Amino acid sequence: MNIIYLHGFKSNSNSIKGKLLQHYCAKYPEIQVHLPDLNMSPNAAIAYVSGLIESMHDVALLGSSLGGFYATHLVAQHAVPAVLINPAMRPWQLFRELFDEQLPYQVHPKWCLDEADLVQLQQLALPVAQDADKILVLLQQGDEVLDYREAHLSLIHI
């Protein structure tokens, strides 16, 4: 089993959640955890993870925040199972609200969020999550940035 952890916005492949997942799964030699760095444009991130999925067998995704948004697209594209942790459902709107005056916004030394990224995010959005039977959604109140109710309403059919 290969688990690909998709980190959230302003995070990276060394995130605490990813490292905890890797540490926990180390007890199970049949599970390999992959922690790709997704600090790149949305289209590049999707292409990169798609390449990983296509190069492996028995793949599942675990996506947090922006990584959860990416996972919904990747499930539809590759029919792999996914767990979404407080997924961002309309990140282009959220980022515009948070950073509109500051675009381009330096997210990471390797990536500046700009208007083209917001357009890419909107184009990646699905009106309804596809392959809903392959998705488990975990929501928690109290997230400092994301309102769990938005994900709940967007994914209520799952």
Stretches found by the model and what they are:
Residues L62-G67, A71:
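Gly/Ala-rich beta-loop-alpha elbow adjacent to hydrolase catalytic centers
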